[in-house]
A protein has these predicted regions:
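Extended, low-complexity cationic-aromatic segments
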Residues: 1-87, 199
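RNase H-like polynucleotidyl transferase catalytic core
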Residues: 45-50, 123-145, 162
Length: 250
């Protein structure tokens, strides 16, 4: 958690831009009956029945210091889709940057190995060398600013029945252009100091130097004089002696 929060405190640097990346799955749904038109005092009304048209995946890369975001809609979510997104990030969005810092969640497709699954080894290494990946902790995806932008995208644009992936692409592109023109960003205020106070329960409790548990560990450590080989010899001899005693008793 503190690793991600530290990234957010870094100053703007054109050679080391900072972005957040997230994705969501959008279910495609079409109408089975035409909606009833608007009437005075009544909104447009939709039938409760609908038809499933599959799903698509929506990637969003957000640069909070620039007030820019880029939406990519794909037919599915695979290693290759994420790999192409990362190549586009370093070659198209920030071609002159030395390294791009990316905050993202620990989804199974968000790994460097995805680049090697998609490109030749030399190309995969070239892309990976230009990326600095910082993963949010488990159950900590709220630390990703891109998740906030995805909520805005869904609430303003995609939270309705859409049955065609081409419509999703067109609507997302229009939303992206409008938000980028306004240079909308996220006013992030949660810091490491806040985390250590408000999320204190998540931190391990440090033991005092002379606490009973610390003293017990020291005593147990002091008793470990012999080497591991000597200890194994003792255990082996003990087993043999115990076996001989059992034979005598029989």
């Amino acid at each position: 958690m503190e690793d991600v929060l530290e990234v957010y405190t870094r100053p703007e640097d054109p050679q080391h831009p900072r972005v957040c990346m997230d994705e969501l799955s959008k279910q495609l749904v079409s109408e089975t009956r035409a909606p009833l038109p608007l009437r005075p005092g009544q909104p447009r009304r939709y039938d409760y029945e609908y038809r499933r048209e599959g799903v698509c995946n929506v990637f969003l890369v957000f640069a909070p210091l620039l007030g820019q975001r880029w939406v990519t809609v794909t037919a599915q979510r695979t290693y290759q889709d994420w790999a192409y997104l990362m190549r586009d990030l370093v070659d198209v969005r920030f071609p002159g940057a030395e390294r791009v810092t990316v905050v993202l969640d620990n989804l199974n497709t968000h790994v460097g190995g995805a680049l090697y699954e998609t490109f030749e080894p030399a190309e995969a290494k070239r892309i990976l060398d230009k990326l600095e990946l910082h993963y949010t902790p488990k159950h900590g995806s709220w630390l990703n600013m891109a998740e906030i932008e995805l909520r805005v995208l869904n609430g303003q644009c995609l939270d309705r029945r859409i049955g065609d992936v081409r419509v999703v692409k067109r609507e997302s592109a229009a939303w992206e252009a409008e938000r980028n023109a306004a240079e909308a960003t996220v006013d992030w205020r949660f810091t490491t100091a806040d985390a250590r106070i408000k999320l204190k329960r998540l931190y391990p409790v440090a033991q005092p130097e002379n606490s009973p548990s610390t003293v017990r560990v020291k005593r147990n450590t002091a008793k470990l004089g012999p080497t591991e080989a000597a200890l194994r010899t003792r255990r082996r001899a003990h087993k043999q002696t115990r076996g001989q005693h059992e034979l005598c008793h029989r």
